[in-house]
């Protein structure tokens, strides 16, 4: 089915989603399956960057992911610890894969790495024991370190390092208009969280423990400029706090968490955050 027809079919099905179920057959099921397959191969993306730097969200692909939950029934998934099974609607991306398929895909997935079907993983990516949710896009030479989560439909660029325990938020629950986007050459420090459609622009470095949501103020310490929802390119960002407003009794109010841009990336920063090509051979 051509992409234009695919989009129209999925949009119409989503508008009538109360009528879609595991018993649904025909054009709607075929359209959703085709969309998931295209996402899985990386031939389409939930969000794409234009030449201007703006990101455009393909809402119909997000709708296809959501419709798949109504179309697919629960089933046992083998491979659990001690011979146990899981119980879910979404199969593993790696279901049925053998050595040749992994070699063709060209990325590493160590034991404990979980990737759901419809997520795309680029060549030379390293997946430590981590979780990549459906509809996500992880581009070439990126490292997803241990216990990190890449949420549904999140877009991760090339040569990104996602450190241990990082949380990259998804779009499905709570439902978000746009996915989290981490552009090329970013470094996300351990236990940092980026959620609610925040965009981290190219080359930015988030220190350990930075939490960013749609309403988090990102303060440039040098200029005083405040950014919300977007980290400027090549920024070095650390956790911070803004002084609180006085309370009714005149006492100082509680401080509000924020993020602080302390500098722009320099050679010293690059030496600490550069990727190791040896790990991607």
Swiss-Prot record:
GO cellular component, one term: cytoplasm
Gene3D superfamilies assigned to the protein according to its UniProt record, in alphabetical order: Hexapeptide repeat proteins, Tetrahydrodipicolinate-N-succinyltransferase, N-terminal domain
Record-listed E.C. numbers: 2.3.1.117
GO terms of molecular function: 2,3,4,5-tetrahydropyridine-2,6-dicarboxylate N-succinyltransferase activity
Principal EC category: transferase
Keyword Membrane in record: no
Domain of life, source organism: Bacteria
Coiled-coil ranges (or none): none
Entry binding sites for substrate: 108, 145
Pathway the protein takes part in: Amino-acid biosynthesis; L-lysine biosynthesis via DAP pathway; LL-2,6-diaminopimelate from (S)-tetrahydrodipicolinate (succinylase route): step 1/3
CDD domains according to UniProt: LbH_THP_succinylT
Cited SUPFAM superfamilies: Trimeric LpxA-like enzymes
GO biological process: diaminopimelate biosynthetic process; lysine biosynthetic process via diaminopimelate
Family classification: Belongs to the transferase hexapeptide repeat family.
UniProt subunit comment: Homotrimer.
Protein name, entry field: 2,3,4,5-tetrahydropyridine-2,6-dicarboxylate N-succinyltransferase
Lineage, broadest ranks: Bacteria, Pseudomonadati, Pseudomonadota, Alphaproteobacteria, Hyphomicrobiales
Gene: dapD
């Amino acid at each position: 089915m051509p992409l234009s027809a695919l989009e129209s079919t999925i949009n119409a099905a989503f508008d009538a989603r109360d009528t879609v179920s595991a018993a649904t057959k025909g054009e709607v099921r075929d359209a959703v399956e085709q969309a998931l397959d295209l996402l899985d191969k990386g031939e389409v993306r939930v969000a794409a960057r234009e030449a201007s730097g703006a990101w455009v969200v393909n809402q119909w692909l997000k709708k296809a992911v959501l419709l798949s939950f109504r179309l697919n029934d629960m089933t046992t998934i083998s491979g659990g610890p001690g011979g146990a099974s899981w119980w879910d609607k979404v199969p593993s991306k790696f279901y049925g894969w053998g050595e040749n398929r992994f070699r063709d895909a060209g990325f590493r997935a160590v034991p404990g790495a979980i990737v759901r079907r419809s997520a795309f993983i680029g060549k030379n990516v390293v997946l430590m024991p981590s979780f990549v949710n459906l509809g996500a896009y992880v581009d070439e030479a990126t490292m997803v370190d241990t216990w990190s989560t890449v949420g549904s439909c999140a877009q991760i660029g090339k040569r990104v390092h996602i450190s241990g325990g990082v949380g990259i938020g998804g779009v499905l629950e709570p439902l978000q208009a746009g996915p989290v986007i981490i552009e090329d050459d970013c470094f996300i420090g351990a236990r940092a969280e980026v959620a609610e459609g925040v965009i981290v622009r190219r080359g930015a470095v988030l220190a350990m423990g930075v939490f960013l949501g749609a309403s988090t103020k990102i303060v440039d310490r040098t200029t005083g400029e405040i950014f919300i929802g977007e980290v400027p390119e090549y920024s070095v960002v650390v956790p911070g706090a803004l002084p609180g407003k006085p309370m009714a009794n005149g006492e100082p109010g509680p401080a509000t968490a924020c993020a602080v841009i302390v500098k722009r990336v320099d050679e010293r920063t690059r030496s600490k955050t550069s990727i190791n090509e040896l790990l991607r051979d």
